[in-house]
Amino acid sequence: MQSKSWLRAGLFAALATAAFAASPARAQGSLVMYCGVQEEWCRAMSNAFEKETGIKVAMTRKSAGEIYAQLKAESSNPRGDIWWGGTGDPHLQAAEEGLTTEYESPMNKELHGWAIDQWKAAKHRSVGIYAGALGFGFNTEQIKAKGIPEPKCWADLLNPKLKDDVQVADPNSSGTAYNLLATVVQLMGEDKGFDYLKALHKNVSQYTKSGAAPAKAASLGETAVGIVFIHDAVVFAVQGDPIKPVAPCEGTGYEIGSMSIVKGARNLDNAKKFYDWALTPAAQALAAPAKSYQVPSNKASPVPAQSPKMDQMKLINYDFVKYGSSAERTRLLAKWDKEVKALPK
């Protein structure tokens, strides 16, 4: 990662006066929202926007890869208006394939550089709304019962005593899992990275559809380890569950969660209103009460106290342009399907 100053600055940010002010129930019309974060945060955002504007929001929650696939399937007859949340890689692929549309928000001037970098990489078709680091969470009771050291590194997840006791999502449906795939390739090199994923496959009990699901499974003791964005493990640690979040010792990748307007949106003006509103400190402050602890993109937005300290982690210089490209993402997913998922257990 080229600079972590944006993270340090965010730690001291205070909630600023919202740049968006709308009188409740005065606006008319509707908005179809595809949401790529946790259900509770999705509903907090859709309900708050509806209350402030009077615009009726029809929200559907899916993983980022699923939303990308839906936009592609609906491209000849778009049904959605705004895609809010989910890892930036599929947002970039959607932008490259013309599934989303250009927009420059007046809020751009208030955003961290990494959020604008995403906007530039997408040729103005997507923007960063939050950041989060990749890692895993382990169930402390299960690890103790197995009599093995607490895992601190990616390499530790290959321990034979963790056979069928690691969960991670499928990168075809999950932006989290694709981020893992791209991270391992960048961290280890493609050949060694795929060797790692093949070895990890022996310990994976289930490839889930949702990227955050393995964190919940680990918190409940349904699996010993869940590979997730670290903030998803923090959710359960904060509420007292026996799960410990880990930033892997070798280094790790991170996401720029993003937002895009669907090309051909039937409610384009309302999509732009939501886009502008979602970039305000007031809207971004809805994350923490919804148990979402990512680092927000507006410089004046409050950073949740529970947020993982990304400036203290060993982060790779994740190449969002390359790994968010249609050709590279398609190639890596096909290779993973053939060389990893198809392997016998």
Where are these regions (language model features)?
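Sec/Tat signal peptide C-region and signal peptidase I cleavage site
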Residues: F20-A27
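A ligand-binding cleft/hinge motif common to bilobed small-molecule-binding domains
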Residues: D89-Q93, S219, A224-P242
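Early extracytoplasmic/lumenal segment of secretory-pathway proteins
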Residues: Q28-Q93
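A bilobed periplasmic-binding-protein/Venus flytrap-type ligand-binding module shared by bacterial periplasmic
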Residues: G137-Q142, A182, I256-N267, L286-P289
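Mature extracytoplasmic/periplasmic domains
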Residues: V262-F320
